[in-house]
C-alpha cells in the first residue's frame, strides 16, 4: 500500500532503528528486502552489523554517529554513513583515504530540527553550502545522498504546515546552491518522514523515509488503510477475590470499594509496561476491558475482573493491539505510540506470523 501511495519512481527507505521500533530489526529488514525495498536506515554501526550478520544485504544508512575507527568496517560491509558536519567529513575522509577505500555518505542538512546536520538557515546559508561542497570533494568519500529531517510534518495545524514547507524550501535551496556551485548531482535526495510521506507528495523527491508509518500506527496509517504490525499479549496467571477495603500493590494506590475479583498478569515495567500507567489504563479480555489496578510492578500487574465473569486463569489478555489500540495507551501515558513499542523489552518473546502462520519465534533464552 505504501508503494502504491508513493508511486513507482520514488524509492523506499524503511527505518528499522531501535530494533525496528521494538518489532525486531532483523525480521523486519528481511521482510522489506523480500518485498523489494530500496534502503534501510539504522541509528548505529552495531544495528547495521546485526543486519549484515543475519543475511541482510540491501543498502543500509546509519543516521547517527559512527566513530572514525569504524570506517573500515563501514567500507568492508558496504554501509552508508550520514555526515553531519565538516569535522565528521574530514575524519571519515582521512580514514577512508588511508585505507584506500571509498565510503558512501549521505549529507545531512539542518533545516530547522536543530539537532544534527550542516546548519544552513539565515546567516549560516553560505557557510553551510560551502561546507557541503567541500565534503562532496573530499578523497575517500562518495556523496550518494543528501537529506534533512522535518520537526512537525506529522502536525496538521497551519503553523506546523508552514514550518514544514519552510524546511522543505530551505532544503531545496541548499541542493540547488550545491549543484550550481560544484556541479554535484545527488542520486538520492530525501526528506519525507512519516508525516511528509503521508501528507506531502511533493516532498517525496527521490526517496521517502517512513518510520512509524511502516508499522501501521497513527492517523496517517489509518488514512492509508494500514494495520498495526504488533499485537502484545499475555495471559492471566492467577486470580483472587478481595473484600472491600483491601489495598492492592505497592504504595496502596488502589483500595477495593466492593468485593473485587482481581487477576494477575506477568507483564510489568521491566517488560515495557510504563509505571506511570498504574491505575490509568485497561487491558482487553475476550469479555471486554479489564481496568488495571494498583501500582504496576517490575514483573507483573493486576487487572480488575469483577465485571467480567468467565474470564479466568490462562485466558489471553491483549495489552495493546487491534482491540486495545496502542495510540490510546500512549495518550494515557502522555507519550507517543513508538515509545511504547520501543519499550517492549527483550525478555518478551516475539512470535512472527505471515498470512496467519507462525514463521519464527524469538526468545530471550535459547535452548
Task: Say what each PLM segment does.
Residues 9, 183-188, 326-331:
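Flexible, glycine/charged-enriched surface loops at secondary-structure junctions
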Residues 18-35, 90-104, 111-235, 242-243, ...:
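Active-site loop/helix belt of alpha/beta enzymes
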Residues 62, 236, 292-293:
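A structural signal for short, hydrophobic beta-strand segments that form beta-sheets
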Residues 1-80, 86, 94, 102, ...:
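A charged N-terminal "starter" segment
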Residues 241-367:
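C-terminal accessory subdomain/extension
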Residues 13, 104-106, 145, 291:
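Hydrophobic "anchor" residues on beta-strands that sit immediately upstream
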Residues 49-55, 220-229, 337:
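C-terminal helical cap(s) of enzyme catalytic domains, especially alpha/beta-barrels
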Residues 51, 146, 236, 314:
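Residue-level signal for inorganic ion chemistry
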